[in-house]
Amino acid sequence: MYSLLFIILMCIPFSFQTVYDDKSVCDSDNKEYMGIEVYVEATLDEPLRQTTCESEIHKYGASVSNGGLNISVDLLNCFLNFHTVGVYTNRDTVYAKFASLDPWTTEPINSMTHDDLVKLTEECIVDIYLKCEVDKTKDFMKTNGNRLKPRDFKTVPPSDVGSMIELQSDYCVNDVTAYVKIYDECGNIKQHSIPTLRDYFTTKNGQPRKILKKKFDNC
């Protein structure tokens, strides 16, 4: 009994030390660790189908299929990867969340050089494509392949990169909102953090917080 207690007490300091060492990745002088979150809200022109959620994460992108809609996101010149995909559905609307994880919790991590970071701020494109997975011969078919035109586009400060979002939708999508956030994953640990970049696209009057409040289930 005493031997077991001794072993447990000896292990406690090492367990705390492991967590601390993991976060020490933020002390690197020649690398930056950036995270990304992409939220998409898409409203279809008919009630969603009852389907099983399927997702795929690949290098510099990810996709999710649910309710008769496929949402794919590709990151061009961003040097970032997604680690999780979440989805939430309600009547005729699909909500999707694509996100990375902190560098001390997963592999491979989103690390980049200072030169990569400069290129990210100047050239990063978040390419979002909404593809309908329903029969195009049905009566509710609309203008096939047309690009939605935003009635309200906003670039949220302090982003100075202009529009990072390029979005194309298929015929069954009535409205879509997309929100992108690129942030310093070590911002709460380092003395000086990199400013967060945000972009927001919508075809209707709304605010990003309407998407952010949704509860997402892992897919």
From Swiss-Prot:
Glycosylation sites: 70
Localization: Secreted
Superkingdom classification of source: Viruses
Secreted found in the keyword field: yes
GO CC annotations, alphabetized: extracellular region
Subcellular location, principal: secreted
InterPro entries to which the protein is assigned, alphabetical: Orthopox_35kDa (IPR003184), Pox_vCCI-like_sf (IPR036540)
Signal peptide: 1-16
Keywords for the protein's UniProt record, in alphabetical order: Early protein, Glycoprotein, Host-virus interaction, Inhibition of host chemokines by virus, Secreted, Signal, Viral immunoevasion
Pfam families: Orthopox_35kD
Record's note on what induces expression: Expressed in the early phase of the viral replicative cycle.
Gene3D superfamilies on file: Major secreted virus protein (2.60.240.10)
Protein's job: May interact with several cellular chemokines to interfere with chemokine-glycosaminoglycan (GAG) interactions at the cell surface to alter chemotaxis of nearby responsive cells.
Family to which the UniProt record says this protein belongs: Belongs to the orthopoxvirus OPG170 family.
Name by which UniProt lists this protein: Protein OPG170
Organism: Vaccinia virus (strain Copenhagen)
